[in-house]
Amino acid sequence: MDEKIAVMDTVDANFKDEWLENVARVLDGAKPDYLVVQHMEPDHAANIENFMKAYPDTTVVANTKTFTMMGNFFRNLNLDGKKLVVANGDSLTLGKHVLTFVFAPMVHWPEVMVTYDSTDKVLFSADGFGKFGALDVEEDWDFEARRYYIGIVGKYGAQVQKLLKAAATLDIQTICPLHGPILTENLGHYLEKYDIWSSYKVESEGVVIAYTSVYGNTKKAVELLAQKLEEKGCPKVTVFDLARDDMAEAVEDAFRYGKLVLATITYNGDIFPFMRTYIENLTERSYQNRTIGLIENGSWAPAAARIMQGMFEKSKNITWLENNVKITSSLSEANEAEIEAMAEELCK
């Protein structure tokens, strides 16, 4: 405890009682002076009003945009005389500890800010450096953090890059995100991953094959391609049936690896709905700097390849394979040769 006590953010509405009990236990009879609100999304801000009922003399610390949102979420919350509005770069002295506020707009909401404690060298990073999963489960940080980043923040790479540049000027020894574990070791690894993800670089060499298949013929083509790639020593091949597998993992791997093959049918003059959803998930998150190959199947008037390619027209730095595959109902010998050529090109 310091001369002044600051509580950082609140929690989801479902954890109200547990959280308030934990706060009271840590305070051990003391009263908090400040509630710092970094992010207004309800999974972190839902208990602001409940906190103020429990500790009515607390001053809420936030920026102007946050207070506007707070009024929209909590129509009956009266904070007259209990607001401290901060600007980017402002500091708040608690005694030994000094908190500095760094604005991080669109990481991933417009009001977001992070807070740096220069005494203990702690970065309270809001949603940044968070991950999915439970704290009592041993798992690879990169996997769930990558999926979290791409799903939640993936569209806002430029804004994350700006925040990383600001963070590079700070001596950070601990990162406290609003999701997932507190990070205390090997911080360079986490910063490096965020730099890769937010600049849309290829993280690992490999090929992702994402497909939909109604009667199994497109699936056979995908299985043959995967077999050929493995035979040729491709470093990593992952295959996703978009109608059955986890869409979020398929999106994650598309951003992780450098090459992507999309295989689907022509369906009602369009592409199969799961494939459309998948591509939209990629393009909405600024998918770029990748190589894409196409496998289309149509019993008559095939249009899937043209439609899929058109969906990436606004994506940056997409390289299209020269060798694509056009199936008419079922695999032919010519198709098998096309798949061989596609595998060869993908392995270059």
Placement of each model-derived feature along the sequence:
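Short, solvent-exposed beta-strand-terminating loops
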Residues: 120-138
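Short N-terminal or domain-adjacent regulatory/targeting segments
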Residues: 176-203, 277
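Active-site neighborhood of phospho(di)ester-bond hydrolases with catalytic His/Asp-centered motifs
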Residues: 8-10, 32-40, 60-63, 123-127, ...
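Conserved beta-strand hairpin/beta-sheet module of binuclear metal-dependent hydrolase folds
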Residues: 1-25, 114-117, 121-125, 218
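Metallo-beta-lactamase
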Residues: 62-112, 156-162
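FMN-binding flavodoxin-like domain, especially the glycine-rich phosphate-binding loop
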Residues: 135-175, 179-182, 224-242, 250-348
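Active-site metal-binding motif and surrounding structural segment of the metallo-beta-lactamase
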Residues: 3, 14-61
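Structural motif
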Residues: 4-6, 34, 97, 121-124, ...
